[in-house]
Each structure stands twice: as C-alpha cells, then as structure tokens.
Amino acid sequence: RLRCLSGHDAISFHMSGTEAVMQAVRLARYHTRRSHLVRFAKADHGWWEASHPGSGDPPSPRETLTLREMDDKTLKTLRSRKDIACVIVNPVQALHPNAGAPEDSTLADSGRRAGADRAAYAAWLQRLRATCTERGIVLIFDEILVGFRLARGGAQEYFGVRADMVTYGKTLGGGLPVGVVCGRADLMRRYREDRPADICLARGTFNAHPYVMAAMKAFLDRLETQPIKALYRGLDRCWDERADRFNRRLHERGLPVRIAHLS
C-alpha cells in the first residue's frame, strides 16, 4: 500500500523521521557518487546537522548548500555544479518559502507572515524537477511534517510532481516512532552492480518493529475506508470554505489576523 500511495518501487523502515532523511541522503550520495546535499533556507528536516545547520549545532557541514526556494539563481547553481547528489524539499514551506516554520518565538511575534499560492509553488517544483532530471540530481520530498494532510498521495499528488524519493514519519505510526523512505528501486538498492561488496548500510535494532508496523497497518487500513476517501475528495473545498468563513469573522471583529492554509 505504501508503494501505491507513494508511487515508488521500494520501501525501507527506520525509527524516526530524521533517520529516514539521513538514509535517503545517504543513498542518493551513494548512487550518484556525488557529495553535496542542497536544502532550502529555513526548512526543517530534523536534527541531523547536515540537513539542519545553524545556531546550537556543530559547525555547518562543508557538503551542505543552503539555497533559496522559488529563485532562478538556485536553478542556475544546480545546473552549474557537478557535485550535487540530491535536493531535499519540505512541502510545508509552500506556506512560507525561505522563512522558518512557526515556533514559540514566532507565534508570539505579530510580524509573522504566511500565505499559500499553490499554483506558484507547484510551478516552482516542476521547474526544480526538470532541472534535477536534467542534471541527474536526486529529488527528495521530506513529507514528515505534512504527513498525508494535503492529499491521500501526499504532497506529490497535491502539487502534481513526482520526487525520486519520499520520506514519511510519525503520521504513519499514529504518533509512534517511525521513519519511512520510499523511492525508485535503483536508488533504494544497498549495493552497486559494479561493486557489490561496497554496501550502503542502514542498520537499526528497532527498524520495522512489529508494534510500530501494526500501528502503521491500522493507519493504512483506515486510509482505505470509504469515509476517509470521501473526506479526501472534498478536502480542498472544505478547508477553503472554513478558512474564508474564519477570516471573515476575524475581519468583522477588526482583528489584524488572517489564517493561511494549503488543504
């Protein structure tokens, strides 16, 4: 069922979203034989220093590039360099490209801004997809934060763009610790045909833990029920109407607050 939902051939199971991201990047580097990871400004990909350099972390990794989303200069960089193994995207950034996700400090700040332009972000992802394909760069969607909130097929379905690898996390396990990587079969192999002994390991004592797998099965079973399928069919209309109604009430009461949403 994960193959069907993600549209990918192979699956691996881990114990957290961060581990899933680490494995996806590791496999991308292994198969492309390139060194560099590209992430986008302010995007959250867990606590691994390679995907989250900054304050409170060790010195920024030399093999991580932080670029801007929805920027032609980023595509130019991807086309000009020969050492980029993968680009990782957190689709929740569609609400606030190149700005940080909400946290305690920003939620208390009246200067917080967000807004979603689905068509513009989808167009950006399509251009990014085309550039990655052209340059042999692995495109990774990190869907751990968005889960399956946007669509039954996740952000790939919602934005109409197919990534080479996708990571999922806590949503699948109903809150239990889980990380999942779905990807093309050629990228998910732990060995290379020309050097079969050069293995790309991904070990974990609790990977695919039976308790977590059972919780995941319960979630996927629920996803297949008719009421949930019906809910997904009306998701955009439902949340557009709710947001409009809520924003009208905020406006009527003279409150300088508006809500932004994706789905």
Which role does the model predict for each range below?
Residues 3-116, 237-240:
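PLP-dependent aspartate aminotransferase-fold enzymes
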Residues 2, 24, 37, 64, ...:
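Buried hydrophobic positions in well-ordered alpha/beta secondary-structure cores of metabolic enzymes
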Residues 90-122, 136-159:
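Conserved PLP phosphate-binding loop immediately N-terminal to the Schiff-base lysine helix
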Residues 226-263:
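Conserved PLP-dependent catalytic core of the aminotransferase class-I/II
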Residues 159-191, 208-215:
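Active-site PLP attachment segment
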Residues 11-18, 41-44, 145, 167-173, ...:
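Active-site nucleophile and cofactor-binding loops and adjacent substrate-binding regions
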Residues 204-235:
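Structural motif of enzymes handling amino- and sulfur-group chemistry
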Residues 31, 129, 134-135, 253:
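Helix C-cap/helix->beta junction micro-motif
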